A protein has these predicted regions:
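Acidic two-metal-ion nuclease catalytic site recognized across multiple nuclease folds
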Residues: 152-216
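Acidic, Mg2+-coordinating catalytic module of metal-dependent nucleases/exonucleases
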Residues: 129-168
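Generic N-terminal initiation segments characterized by hydrophobic and/or small/turn-forming residues
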Residues: 1-4, 146
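Solvent-exposed, non-transmembrane amphipathic alpha-helical segments
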Residues: 29-30, 66, 124, 144, ...
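Short alpha-helical interface elements
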Residues: 62, 71, 128-129, 149-152, ...
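Mg2+-dependent endonuclease catalytic cores in nucleic-acid-processing enzymes, primarily RNase H-like
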Residues: 3-133, 188-216
Length: 216
């Protein structure tokens, strides 16, 4: 559970032996608690994946009654060229996972997201790049990370609805895509940086060296 627009984790529930009906009841209880404490359900947002086990969750939510869960059930926008029947929630693919992982990495590295959960921090420590994707090390789990990635995808949708989320989310995106360093031909002291956030700070360090040399 994350608070916006601070991106601070405020709660967490994890239990791998609870069936999907039980999970939906817990989701409802959490949303009810937030709505009661905040005295409003208009700022409560929740969602689920709609592929894999998530398909079963959609069936249970339908039986449980979406109207019985406070807040808004957030779904990804219909993409251009989408041919399948629309389903609520978020469909996780290789591409969407990579994008969400990249954003999570950027936000954590730049202190844009505050993680309070020790179990989640433990999962992050064993979450590694494997080939062209990310996965937990052998024997480790990534359930909490998957939930966080879903929360990030929800935030990406919410930024188009709430200007406060839009502003903070866009500030985070400014740290992304910073690898390649090139000199501008017209402005020799102007350096364009593109690539990953990790290399952004390395690029800034190199810029400082260049500026110091040019001032000598």
């Amino acid at each position: 559970v994350f608070e916006l627009p601070s991106y601070e984790q405020v709660a967490e529930w994890q239990h791998n032996q609870t069936g999907i009906p039980g999970q939906v009841r817990v989701l409802s209880d959490i949303c009810n608690y937030i709505a009661t404490e905040s005295k409003s359900d208009t700022n409560v947002y929740w969602s689920v994946e709609n592929n894999g086990i998530g398909e079963a969750a959609l069936i249970v939510i339908n039986d449980f009654g979406e109207e019985n869960i406070p807040g808004l059930f957030v779904s990804e926008p219909i993409r251009k060229g989408h041919v399948r029947k629309f389903r609520k929630g978020f469909n996780t693919t290789h591409g969407t996972k990579i994008t969400a992982c990249s954003r999570l990495k950027t936000m954590v590295e730049n202190d844009k997201m505050i993680i309070r959960s020790k179990p989640l921090i433990g999962e992050l420590k064993s979450f590694i790049a494997t080939g062209s994707s990310y996965t937990a090390k052998s024997g480790a789990h990534d359930d909490l990370i998957s939930a966080t990635l879903l929360a990030l995808r929800m935030m990406e949708v919410l930024k188009d609805w709430d200007p406060r989320v839009y502003n903070t989310f866009n500030q985070t995106e400014e740290f992304e895509d910073y690898t390649k360093i090139t000199h501008d031909k017209d402005e020799p002291n102007l350096i364009i940086i593109k690539g990953t956030s990790t290399e952004y700070f390395e690029a800034r360090r190199r810029i400082s060296k260049i500026v110091r040399k040019s001032s000598l």
